[in-house]
Amino acid sequence: MLKNPFKKKSIADKYQTLIREINALESTVKTLTDGELRNKTNQLKQRYQDEQNLNNLIVESFALTREASYRTLGLRHFDVQLIGGLVLNGGKIAEMRTGEGKTLVATLPAYLNALTKKGVHIVTVNEYLASRDQTSMGQIYRFLGLETGLIQEKMTTPERQRNYKADITYVTNNELGFDYLRDNLALNIRDVFLRPFNYCIVDEVDSVLIDEALTPLIIANSVKTCVDKYIIASEITDYLELNVHFEIDEKNKSVLLTNQGTIQIEKILGVQDLYNPRDPWIPYVINAIRASSLFFRDVHYIVQNNRIVIVDEFTGRIMPDRRWRHGLHQAVEAKENVAIRQTTEITASITYQNFFLVYPKLSGMTGTAKTAEVEFDKIYSLPVEEIPTARPNLRQDLPDLIYKDEFSKWNAIAKECQNISLVKQPILIGTTTVEKSEMLAQLLQEYRLSHQILNAKPENVRRESEIVAQAGKKGSITIATNMAGRGTDIILGGNIQFKVRKDLYNILVTYKYQTKENKKDSLSRSLQIFPLLKKLQRTSQKFLTVLNCLINNKQFLNLSDVEVLKILNESELIRVPKISYQCSMKFLINELVNFEKKTQKLDNVIVKNLGGLYIIGTERNDSQRIDNQLRGRCGRQGDPGKSRFFLSVEDKLIRLFGDARLENVLKSQLLDDLPLESELVTKILDSAQKRVEERNYELRKNLFDYDDILNKQRNVVYYERRKVLESESARIKILAYGEQVISEITSKLRRKKVFGSQLISRIRNLLGTKFLLNFPSSDLNNLESIDFQTYLLQEFWLSYESKILELEVEYPGIIQEFERTLILIYMDREWKEHLQKMSLLRDAVGWRKYGQRNPLSEYKEDAYKLFKYRGIVTRHLVIYELLRSSIL
Amino acid sequence: MKQTDDKDSLLNRLLLSLGILLFIRMGTFLPVPGIDHGHLEFYIERHFRLRTLVSTFAGDNTVVVGLFTLNIFPYINASIIMQLLVSLLPGLSKLQKEGGAEARRSINSLTRLLTLGWSLIQSTSVAFYLKRALFEWNLVLAFEIVIWLTTGAMIVLWLSEIITEYGLGNGPSLLIYTNIVSSLPGFVKQVITESSGKVPIGSWLLSGFVLFVALYGIVLLQEGMRKVYLISSKQLNQTSLPFSGSSNLESGYYIPLRFNQAGVMPIILTTAVLVIPTFIYNLGLLRILTPLITLPVFVKSYKIIYWVSYFVLILLFSLFYSTIVVNPKDLSDELQKMAVSIPGIRPGVETTFYLKQVMKRVTLLGAIMLALLATLPNIIQAILSLSGFTNLGTTSLLILVGVILDLTREMRSIILSNIYYDMFD
């Protein structure tokens, strides 16, 4: 709150001394042999064990990592990258521009924190990135004597456990979160994947912690659903008219059924009351209307293999495992006439917000964090530090152009493309939805402009890397959704690595089959097939020789096509291959790269002279960060580049959150084709965007405040559960439960004034045994409460012991497992029930504000009651089930 | 876990609140420079009326014009005005209802501006009032006094917001609370000195009993509510309906309609309105009626008329104000929007009607209680002839009880969020 403005040092100054020390150490480290370097790791590990302080090891470990990186990958960390590493190690967020080598920066703190032997997790947004980073960066760690692990979706339990045990594990946020939840549903300690959390670096941290904050991770089991109602409700929507029978609220994505609408539906269905608890229709109707009027195909979802697949708004990617909740997904399925899948019931869930707070030390990196600084600080206590770029940024952000309506906007975009393409400057056009990207593609077709299109449609997704690789080429036009955002690296003049790999793959696969068919002298003959080889013949005979060797290599011939592709893809990441054919292939690639380099360099210079990549935004996104992600595609590593947004008064952002008066003025003043280019309007748009961001922030903050309580409860339950899971025997727990149950029962019965024979039968019912059989009811009334409890306890102990003996005789050795499982199962069941109640409660407390009550306080109050109730029910069920259980 | 730990610690918050309250209290006694307090004291000894003025500002019998003399009252007045404006001006009420954080911020800053304006007015009036008391009074000094007092008021406002944000309790209400509490000793003294010897023990006991009843009634009034149970689409959608076995009672879906939606506002408004006749009378406009008013019959019945109108006005303002706080039409629309309904009652007009009726009954009950509680002390005073009893008006009692209830609720909420930390055995 009180910050002295004069005291704020620049980030470079703050870490000046450390950087100097690391640089000073470089010459010493350089003289060490590989073996000595590796030995250093053990020394540092030992030093950590002795001192328990990582800060003393920063300088040495950073210097080591830098040297190891230089020796393995040939990459030496820049000073700014060291700063990035220091920021990450300080548990903060490092904002680094695209192409500044975030992956390499992460190695510094990862190595340092792995010295604790407690494990480091590096979290990426998708599996491709995880495996790419693990393969390339893994070499550094291996060189230094550390193990790396990689988690992939299809891995088995032992594989997962092994990979999580590694010093440094690369994993996607999704897998990690679900593994955490699964760990807390495990019935056996052997099935647990994760070790206690230590340190985590989240890549694209704003995507994970902010954009996805509102979508919780959910493990659910399906329950039987009646699909008829969804279908009928979906059909009813055909007989409803907008603004007569229902109204929609685009801002909140909600619909309102008017009185007329209610009557209409009741008439169609022939029911009295839509809210009838015995035959409820209202949820189905509301969802059907929402599905038909607020959720659109190719905007919010696509239909793939007869299934509804959600398209993520922020990344533009499909989310095959995600489903809308509360019956909305089923309603959309009914609308699209695809098979309706069963509804689900949450058994475990956590939000990313709370999941990542489990880590004692958390840090993250991204290209766009500064605009969300407040949120990171308030919710996650993560300060954001901007890391300076290694080279100055040359990107030019042109002011927005605003058009009268959508039509003139899109036309203007197409015309702009036409003009730009005359000089062959590459263009990347960002659209917000699949639908719009395809609409624009058609428009460009009419203008006879060749283009590539990248969106969530499966046929386009398959070609993603190819499209991206060529997006920087001279004269290329690429239309993309937000998919061309994070992690997309567009190289000016095209990516030769990719082109080379593609060419070589075609050559190798062709020859592989030809040699397999024993056509000995294929090489010379098929020079004709590949013009490339013919050209090469003149420059590099060596290439052909190696190629010839390779295609006669037995090992190589046994590889499948996919494996060839894999080796080719990884060859760039691995510097020193081990197997002979890998060496040969690496050589071939290098040779080809060298051959192509000249043309590529020329292309690169030409494109640079044209002004680099030209980014066209077609609509402002809800968040400035997403726009910046798109802009960040150009101007990487000091390249030139330009970006401009084409907007119209009819855009969603302006329509919903802009100023109505401004809209009218703009509409009346703007001519058909003439855009408005003014700083003022841009500023107004910025403020509208800020408003949306703030609204969303409020939503997330609100979610966080409420979820905080549930999270605390979850921590308690998971802690208790883990203790049971890890314990040799749950005997103590059972005894404790028994005591609690008995005192709860007796005090409750006393309160309700139940006496005599009624008391006996009640207790028998509650505990499910033949307690008190030989106890005259008259005596009961005379007993003091405490004596009565003692008596019951004795009875309980006796029955418990006899039960154990009974089980031990029949099934020796089973009792411990039995007890443990019993507790775990009931804990999980009651937790599941509790989750449902809490979700309803969350909804219910909103109405309390009409009594001038703070909903959050009310939530806390009722949540605590529910939580206590959950504990009581769990204990009762466990004891009841234990005492009743008989051997089957 | 760690980051919420220290932020929400009850002790830290309590200490912060106490510290700031103490600081403001001290600032109240910090003399404004330029005012010769010797002269002031001298003047005040002669002019009793001014004495009451100055002491009411600071809440007790000081003769110091302190830096924080204006205290939180400019803000209170400003927020009352703001509240009325919001409910009366459609533009503002729309802003408050639909806008998110930004709207709240702009309303807040408007309130602060109003506070500034109000403190300027109030400090100017103080400055000119002091003209009579100070020998060396001149315009420059008056200007300085205005600056000092206004600055003081704004600092108090800032500090009170810090309490609300980082401390325990709501800053402004805590400040009013301390002001009321700090006047209690003086009030007791006054009652004792003014009625010493004249009053039998019995009336003392009786008045103590009445006070107890009044407090009990106020708590009941503040906490009492009627729950209107709801059934929501989401609830019906739950596949295994955890509440289906039991009645709605357990579900937590209800609207609490409080007996006293309006708080102390009706009393404040009533008092304000009832000042007007006296004011007019003082202005001399009613001089023609003077012979009539001075008639002995009229003087006797004047008090009765006053209290009856007091009672009726509170009743009316309560009813009026509660519809501002919760508008049945808005509520019904909101229910419809969220696809929630009251069991057995159709959404739309029927729901509006139902809510209107329920609210009318609830508020009427609350309004009668409030009016009774407000007039009760005066009646007691009249019967027992315990003068000074009215000084501790129902408004003060309502505020005291309200603040304490809010405090306990906030403390409970903090405890309930930290209670889970103790469950790791």
Curated annotation (Swiss-Prot), chain A:
Alphabetized UniProt keyword annotations: ATP-binding, Chloroplast, Membrane, Nucleotide-binding, Plastid, Protein transport, Thylakoid, Translocase, Translocation, Transport
GO molecular function annotations of the record: ATP binding; protein-exporting ATPase activity
Enzyme Commission numbers on file: 7.4.2.8
Chief subcellular location: plastid
Topological category with respect to the lipid bilayer: Peripheral membrane protein
EC top class, as a word: translocase
Entry-linked Pfam families: P-loop_SecA, SecA_DEAD, SecA_PP_bind, SecA_SW
Protein's cellular compartments: Plastid, Chloroplast stroma; Plastid, Chloroplast thylakoid membrane
Catalysis: reaction(s): ATP + H2O + cellular proteinSide 1 = ADP + phosphate + cellular proteinSide 2
Source species, domain of life: Eukaryota
Spans traversing the lipid bilayer: none
UniProt binding sites for ATP: Q81, G99, E100, G101, K102, T103, D489
Keyword Magnesium: no
One GO location term (cellular component): chloroplast thylakoid membrane
Gene Ontology biological-process entries: intracellular protein transmembrane transport; protein import; protein targeting
Function: Has a central role in coupling the hydrolysis of ATP to the transfer of proteins across the thylakoid membrane.
Alphabetical list of NCBIfam families matching this protein: secA
Entry similarity comment: Belongs to the SecA family.
Name listed for the protein in its UniProt record: Protein translocase subunit SecA
UniProtKB/Swiss-Prot annotation, chain B:
UniProt subcellular location: Plastid, Chloroplast thylakoid membrane
Sequence intervals crossing the membrane: 15-35, 62-82, 113-131, 139-159, 168-188, 201-221, 266-286, 304-324, 364-384, 385-405
Keyword Plastid appears in the UniProt entry: yes
PROSITE patterns to which the protein is assigned, alphabetical: SECY_1, SECY_2
Function: The central subunit of the protein translocation channel SecYE. Consists of two halves formed by TMs 1-5 and 6-10. These two domains form a lateral gate at the front which open onto the bilayer between TMs 2 and 7, and are clamped together by SecE at the back. The channel is closed by both a pore ring composed of hydrophobic SecY resides and a short helix (helix 2A) on the extracellular side of the membrane which forms a plug.
Family to which the UniProt record says this protein belongs: Belongs to the SecY/SEC61-alpha family.
Protein's recorded name: Protein translocase subunit SecY
Species per Swiss-Prot/TrEMBL record: Trieres chinensis (Marine centric diatom)
Gene from which this protein is expressed: secY
